Structures are given as structure tokens and as C-alpha cells.
Amino acid sequence: NEGHKARMASVIFHAFNQIKETGLVKLFKSHRPDFKDGEQLRDFIYVKDLVNVIGWMMHEMFASNWTPAKNGLYNLGTGKARSFYDLAANTFIAQGLKPNIEFIDMPLDIRDKYQYFTEANMAKLRATGYDKPFSTLEEGVQDYVANYLVPAKGY
């Protein structure tokens, strides 16, 4: 449950609650001509995939398959950036609803600093031997909404 995170909760969590309360999701307009509204891109990764990677790394360490050359920081994502629009639309779809998205101005204090594109380079992780696929955005949203948000599971 992400309720305790307030503003720092995931986009899906906020979208789900906006849909429940208002029937729509608000996303930032783009303030750059090379990105359409809602098409700002992030490399969204499902937390279950992160847990799988960490579990695999620990298994490799205990099995003595981990070498010092593999030590270091890893940038984890899926290696495929997706839009905030896709994330919001799939939050509706996971509930059997038609997407209803409104675009609002980005606050001035973040407008000039906002990152329009982030995507993890997965080469380092793949070079360690991790070859499992990651959940698609659609799969991750569907699972999270259906199994955690709709039943309002709290932990």
C-alpha cells in the first residue's frame, strides 16, 4: 500500500485515486514542441520485476556465481521508455473503463527542469547473465490495479 507516501506515491496510485474521485486523470501538458501532451517518456518498471532482479543477484552471490567484476550500481528499468499517457490509459483499461485524460499546465517551478525522456540502459545487467523478460507496462498496471488497488489491500 502506498497511501503513506502522499505526493511520492506512484503515478498509478495517484491515477487510480483520481479516477475513483473524479472519473478522470490529469497529466501535464508538454511545454516542448517535440513532445505531445502526455507523451513525456519514462522507463516504468514494475516493482515485482525489481524484486526478481535483486533475488536473482542474491542467488548468484550465494551460489558463488557472482564475481567482483559484477559489483557496482545498476540502473534498473525495462530498457523501453513509455508515455505517461500510456500509463494513465492503462489504469483506466485495467478497471474496464474508457480513458478520460485531461492535460494541465506544468507548474512553472519545474517546467525548465522537467525531464521529458528517461530510459535505463540495461547492458550492464544483461552482461551479468540476467536474461528474464520484464513485465510490459500493460501487465504491470493490470496486476497492480486488479490485485492491490481494487481490493484496497493494506500492508
Would you name each region that the model predicts?
Residues 1-11, 35:
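Flexible, glycine-rich beta-alpha linker
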